[in-house]
């Protein structure tokens, strides 16, 4: 395998790692959203309860002023909460897009490697050649349980765990 393929493998794993981290970050941020959204019903209830206590009597201007101040404070809190939610949603979208971009970049690094392998080992369908068989020796030739596998045989999970 050429040096450029080794470099591409390294870059591909690095990009895949970054994609995984971005996806993990997006999921963690997404999981924070319900905690923020749970605040909205409380804020709305507070605003309605304060609005219901407004006094229509003109003599209670000061009382109404305090209630309106409380309502305004609750609205500002709701707006700040919504802004925080918007930031979380934007972070989720940004991290998700970064994960996708890194996966695409990973494929660009792996593509030449796949092409090299395909060009080196693919049997031409128009020629009469035998398919390439990979011989494996498990575990070593000096042990009593040594045997050879050709590419047409399969190894089961139980056999792998045995060794």
Curated annotation (Swiss-Prot):
Pfam families attached to this UniProt entry: DUF5424
Name this polypeptide is given: Uncharacterized protein RC0060
